[in-house]
Amino acid sequence: MRNEVKLANPNYDSSKIEEFKNVWVFCEQRQGQMMSTSYELISEGRKLADELGVKLCGLLVGDNVGDLAESIGGYGADEVIVCDHPLLKNYTTDAYAKVICDVISEMKPEAFLIGATNIGRDLGPRCAARLHTGLCADCTHLDVDMPIYKDFLRGASTLPEAKIDGMATAKVMGKDHDVSRDLKMTRPAFGGNLMATIICPRFRPSMATVRPGVMKKAAYDEAKAKAVKVTKYDVKLDAADLQTEVVEVVKAAKKLVDLVGADYIVSVGRGISKDVEGGIKLAHELADVLGGVVGGSRVAIDSGWLTADHQVGQTGKTVHPKIYVALGIS
């Protein structure tokens, strides 16, 4: 049954795409600290909003998080919509999904970007299902403007020039559809062996989760931070809306590998298979000397040589270190 969960706007219809406007970014915070990926997406969202000629809005959800709105404006947001409520202090799927879907059903953005963090990967599909729209997961590139998208294809694909030049429409339900205002979401497919570009032509908002680290964070602008418009959304939420309760937040004793933020990475791959123990040891020693971290290819992870948080590449984390050393990776 369509839209089984009640939304704040009972007349919401995702197929009436002409009613949707503006680009939104979910600005993820944890314990009052903004996630870096949120600033990356605000910077990317600024580009998309400019291409569409619309506003860029940051969506900030939590408890007493209004003070973070200014920093979101500093990276390019025109407006920050703040959803403040005590039950939003700690992330729970039920509470965040309800509030986000409520505000979207009322304000109707045409595009909604979410960081592909653990929270974003949980939240995105739930919201897309409730809002009866499409979600492209784990994106590494976004475009709206066709000339810009075509330039991207020329540099990132093997498509012939005639094929790229002829792109203007797509077949949707057997009819030609003008893709000029559609968000073009590119992501790895088939285990990272191909890149696929996906559009959501029949419903809005177009939703995408985006890998942390793939979008460039803009320079912070103090003037924009001071000028950002802050709108407080009237959150309607009570304990009955939640099926779970966060009793305590315990930080992991084991520190996860920060590949995305690392300046120096030493990665290992299939080529160390003749001496895995020696290869891994060498990688760690070199990483320690450089003050960096150890990464690995998909083969290294699938073979159990390293844990999944070390994986680099199309099917792992996208990284931008100052120095990247590849051992046994072709």
Description of each model-found segment:
Residues 1-330:
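N-terminal glycine-rich FAD/FM-binding segment characteristic of electron-transfer flavoproteins
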